[in-house]
């Protein structure tokens, strides 16, 4: 699926690692701002049954707010939830195999800091290609650091939407948008912020 980019909806929100009691209310408020284009459910420590229950609730909130709902790592779960697509890392199922499962849905690919990986993803018709981490982050262990110049380099090669990820916050997000990132993936800055409530981080 070709992913249409709405410049007003430049945020790609990723779920917190743990679903807390207030989460669904916070998510609803954030999506109602109209700044989020995609939402990814990324829950590493939950059972399949728990993911299905949580995913159904999230999908409903996303649908009401015109936000695409994606599932991390798991095309089969994405299909089961009738999600809008999935995100795949380099160690997950191949894009071609995932395409057989989810059909003409969104499939995004992690490319770390590699133009070579991006070229493969583009050739395989990924819906978007993701690069990072651009900045330090506590959300997950950083194995790959990306430099901002890769965004401009890849933009010259393709019209495939580009996602920037890793340590993005209020102080650095504009730099990424000005250097050809179409979407900014955020998680820790929203959900683990000790200074601001989730909604306040993106207002």
Q: Language-model features: where?
A:
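Alpha-helix-loop-beta-strand connector modules within alpha/beta enzyme cores
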Residues: 52-71, 97-114, 143-170, 201-203
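Catalytic cores of alpha/beta
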Residues: 30, 69-84, 98, 113-126, ...
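Active-site mouth loops of central-metabolism enzymes
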Residues: 7-25, 106-113, 163-164, 168
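Structural preference for beta-strand elements that scaffold enzyme active sites
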Residues: 10-12, 36-40, 66-70, 84-87, ...
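Glycine/Thr-rich beta-alpha phosphate-binding loop at enzyme active sites
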Residues: 80-90, 109-156, 193-198
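Glycine-rich phosphate-binding active-site loops on the catalytic face of alpha/beta enzymes
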Residues: 13, 88-97, 130-143, 170-203
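N-terminal active-site wall of soluble small-molecule enzyme domains
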Residues: 38-101
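Catalytic domains of carbohydrate-active enzymes, especially glycoside hydrolases
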Residues: 27-42, 124
């Amino acid at each position: 699926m070709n992913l249409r980019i709405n410049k007003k909806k430049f945020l790609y929100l990723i779920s917190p690692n743990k679903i807390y009691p207030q989460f669904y209310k916070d998510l609803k408020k954030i999506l109602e701002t109209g700044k989020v284009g995609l939402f990814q459910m990324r829950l590493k420590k939950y059972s399949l049954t728990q993911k299905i229950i949580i995913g159904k609730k999230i999908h409903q909130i996303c649908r009401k707010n015109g936000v695409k709902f994606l599932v991390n790592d798991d095309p089969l779960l994405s299909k089961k939830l009738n999600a809008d697509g999935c995100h795949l890392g380099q160690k997950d199922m191949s894009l071609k195999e995932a395409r057989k499962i989810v059909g003409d849905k969104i499939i995004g690919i992690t490319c770390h800091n590699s133009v070579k990986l991006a070229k493969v993803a583009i050739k395989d018709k990924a819906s978007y290609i993701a690069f990072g981490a651009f900045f330090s982050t506590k959300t997950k262990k950083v194995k790959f650091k990306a430099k901002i110049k890769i965004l401009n380099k890849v933009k010259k090669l393709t019209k495939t939407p580009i996602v920037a990820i890793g340590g993005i916050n209020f102080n650095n997000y504009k730099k990424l948008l000005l250097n050809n990132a179409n979407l900014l993936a955020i998680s820790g800055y929203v959900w683990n912020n000790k200074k601001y409530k989730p909604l306040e981080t993106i207002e």
